[in-house]
Amino acid sequence: MEAFIPMITGKLNKVRLGSCARNIVSRQRLAVALRASLALCGILVSVRPASAQAAAPLWTFAVSGDSRNCGDFVMPAIAAKVKADGDAFYWHLGDFRWISSPDEDLLAMHPDMKREDYQSLAWDDFLTHQIASFGSIPVFLGRGNHENIKPMTRDGYIAKFSSFLDRPEIAAQRITDGSAAAPPGPWYHWTQGWVDFITLDNASQEEFSTSQLKWLRFVLDRDLAPNSGVRAIVVGMHEALPHSTGSEHAMDDWDLGDRTGSLVYTWLYDAQAAGKHVYIIASHSHYYSPAIFNTPYWKQYSNEVVPGFIIGSAGARRYPLPRSADKDALTHIYGFLQGAVQSDGSIVFTLHELTEDDLIQARWQDTPLDAIHDCFVNNAESVR
C-alpha cells in the first residue's frame, strides 16, 4: 500500500509504508486507520510534569543540548540530578561552548580573557567544568553548529572528542554492524536494552550527506528486521528536522537540509507505522518544546506524527518561543528531558527544570554567586 509523503525532492512522491501499515490500511483510509492502529500499538507519547504519577519505568536516561554561555554553571546541576535519579546515561546534543565570543561563565572567572586565549581553552573547559561533573555516568556527545566554528573543524572535533565518539557501547555496536558500520565520528548509534539510540550530525550545511543517509538507512532496516529485538528508536540531533514548530531555526535554513531532513522524517514515520516506538529529539533552539511535528505541514499527510522535542536548555542564552510552539512549551528555563523506558516498549519523557538553588548547590569551588544569579535571571534574548 502506498501513501503520499514528501521525499528528497521536496515534492509529493510515493514512498512505501512499513508492513504494519501495509497490512491494515488503504490509501483512502490512511489517516483514520493509522490513528487507530498506532494507538493499539501504544505509539503515542505523553510528556508529564515531574509531579505526575506514572508506572515505574524499567530504566531512565537524560538528554539536553546547548550548554554554551552559562553551561559551566548549569551542567553541574544537570549532572547532580542525573546521578541522584540513577539515569543510565546523559546525551548532549551539541553546542558545548560559544566559540565566536567568550562564554559568560568563563568571563565571570576571567574577566580580562582575550578571544584567542578563550578559543584555545574552551573545549578543555567544557570537559573540565561540564562533563567531569557526571563522574562515572556515561556521556554521549552530538555535534552542534558551534563545534563547526573555526578554528574547530569536523576532523578536529573527531580528534578532540574521540574517547566519547568511540565509547565501549559504540565500539561494540560497530562490531555488531560489521562492514556497514560508520567509522568513529559525529554520527553513530548504540543499542541499550531494546532501544536503539541514534546520533545524527546536522551541524553543517553539508548534511545530511549521502554517506550519512546510507548509514542511517542501514540502521533503520536493521531495526525493522524480524527478530531484531528493537522496540523503540530514539534519534538525537542538534537541529530539528524540517517543518517543525521550530522551523525558524532548524534544517529548514538550507536547501540540502530541508530536502534530506524531510526524507529522514519520512523514514522515521515509516518505522513508527511499522510498529516501532519512535522519538526525535533536537536542541539548537534554546527552549523546551514538545510535539514539534504536530504542524499543518506534516499533518496534511497523517494525523499521527512522530513525537518530537526541542530541549536546548543546558545553559545557552534563552530564546523567545515561536508562535507555533505547543501550549506546554517553556522558555527562560534551564533543564533536561528524562526518558523513562516502559515495559511495553514506549518511552515517557519528562521535563526536569532546574532552580537557581540547584545551580548554587552544584557549583564549582570559587564560582561567584552573583555570576550564577546573573546567568539564571538574565542570559536571554528578547527579540530574534
Where do the PLM segments sit?
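Short acidic, glycine-rich surface-loop motifs adjacent to enzyme active sites
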Residues: 223-250
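N-terminal secretory signal peptides that target proteins for export/translocation
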Residues: 1-29
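Extended active-site neighborhood of metal-dependent phosphoesterases/phosphodiesterases
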Residues: 60, 104-229, 252-277, 287-340
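Bacterial N-terminal signal peptides
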Residues: 33-45
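A short C-terminal boundary segment appended to hydrolase-like catalytic domains
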Residues: 326-384
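Active-site glycine-centered loops adjacent to acidic/histidine catalytic or metal-binding residues
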Residues: 66, 94-95, 144-145, 238, ...
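N-terminal active-site segment of His-dependent metallophosphoesterases
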Residues: 52-117
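Cleavable N-terminal signal peptides
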Residues: 39, 50-52
